[in-house]
């Protein structure tokens, strides 16, 4: 991307952020553009803030124009405005009335692209994840695109996969995520995957990233900050009785579905069942509380990519921050599901 093109894009983005809309379907907000978050000390001891960095990543600035991937593939074009407008009324009702969503911390987002990392809950429908994506559209509209990520099984489903791509969802490969950053977009990851969304109900307020640390190096290579996201309530939409790890091994689900679990759930309207598909339950109307935390700026020195101790330390720090925030959010719950 040339300098003049980048400046023109930035001017266009700033202009679009000043416009106002209220609903998810309208795709704009009447709020001011979020400010850079409070400076956070990174692993190398330096303090940095979001500042007024351009949406294009530092890593992208050193690349030749164009991505290695066609931006029309795998949801890289971002959410389809027509689809978002068409389904906006439904999602507004779900967020505001059914799940009574509370989401805070917009002002902590840096102005530059970032990698959001959090937990998602409630089996394959993960309503806490969906509400973040839809609330993001309501907040920013087309001025700042967020790409969700989804398991290969969902992305390759004939109908569901196309719907996901129209929402801007991408498969969580390194190339896809880097291509999104190169466009100046944001990405959200849930590293825990099936270990996270199928954790038992008694662990519903536990941050599970599954020991999967690849996202740390992704952010380091791209030169983007990591923004942790904490949430509670989503795991009250479905009761996971057992993760079924032994059953998953017996059924060879690791090879068949890239899953280490075969969960047994209690849900409405099907009762107790082996839960392997997205359409086996209707989420209960649990109140969802979500908080966007301060950005964490990683050391982008290439030599750090091979520093396992540094990667481990940053992973533990991020997981701990999410857990502390989840504990605080859980204290507000008066009663499971309904409060």
What is each model feature region?
Residues 163, 179, 217-221:
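Hydrophobic/aromatic ligand-binding patch that stacks against planar heteroaromatic rings
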Residues 25, 35-176, 244, 320, ...:
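Membrane-anchoring hydrophobic helices of lipid-metabolizing enzymes
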Residues 115-117, 188-190, 291:
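Structural motif
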Residues 193, 203-303:
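A cross-family acyltransferase "interaction/gating" segment
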Residues 1-39:
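N-terminal acidic, proline/glycine-rich, low-complexity intrinsically disordered segments
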